[in-house]
Regions:
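Metal- and O2-centered redox machinery and metal/ROS homeostasis
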Residues: 1-239
Length: 239
């Protein structure tokens, strides 16, 4: 029996979404304060995370996994776009210039652990990252472009989904796919729980970046920008 997983994920992660938006790094980002050094570290972190996720989901999709396979839309993949952004920020030798941070390593380890022990839970990770990127990508791209004085595509390919010309239609199809996965309510609950864990793993990456951001803009400005809590402006955008 199919369960309404899409709405359960949306409603069940609202609190975590708001908490993520209120981390210091994201709060400053949404207000247009973006430090390039911190941002490029985030791009590197995301590269390691998406590489792990796309390797595991691709493997499970290729073997016909009944739950993970259907959500593994290749047009969502971000690894190639992140490689282009890393080449912009670090140069063509970017592979030798980046290293995984402790928070990103913990995130990657969790992805591999879930893939090995309970692959269905990868759906929670997939939803948290990809649909968040697709829903808020253009807004975040515009903020980053203006804050770092970048060209139209310079270092911002991550936010571009060229293989998805109709984002609204894609998200409708994605929601329908979630709702038709062959899972029961107990598994749906576990997937929502894992999606919340994914939000917290993202928050750890953001919090890890705050030291660099404070060094760049100063404690006083950082405190001013982060003293008010946001209500969760992008919650309703997710699938």
């Amino acid at each position: 029996m199919a369960v309404a997983l899409a709405s359960q994920l949306r409603e069940g992660t609202k609190k975590s979404h708001t908490m993520a938006e209120n981390t210091g790094f994201v709060s400053c980002f949404l207000k247009g304060v973006v430090d390039k050094a911190s941002y490029r570290t985030l791009v590197a972190d995301l590269y390691f995370v998406y590489t792990a996720m796309e390797e595991e989901i691709g493997r499970l999709r290729a073997t016909g996994h009944p739950v993970v396979g259907p959500v593994g839309f290749p047009e969502l993949n971000r690894r190639e776009t992140l490689e282009q952004d890393l080449a912009f920020y670090f140069g063509e030798s970017w592979r030798s210039a980046i290293s995984v941070t402790p928070a990103a390593q913990a995130y990657v380890a969790r992805i591999h652990q879930v893939a090995a022990e309970a692959p269905e839970l990868l759906v929670g990770h997939h939803y948290t990252r990809y649909i968040g990127d697709l829903s808020g990508g253009q807004i975040l791209k515009n903020i980053a472009q203006k804050a770092m004085n970048l060209g139209e595509h310079d270092g911002l390919r991550f936010y571009e989904f060229g293989a998805i010309p109709d984002e609204k239609g894609f998200k409708i199809n994605y929601r329908a796919t979630l709702d038709n996965l062959p899972i029961d309510q107990a598994m749906a609950d576990r997937i929502v729980e894992e999606a919340n864990h994914a939000f917290h793993l993202n928050m750890r990456m953001f919090q890890e970046l705050e030291g660099n951001l404070i060094a760049a803009i100063g404690k006083v400005l950082f405190g001013f920008l982060t003293r008010r809590q946001r209500a969760g402006s992008t919650e309703a955008v997710a699938a």
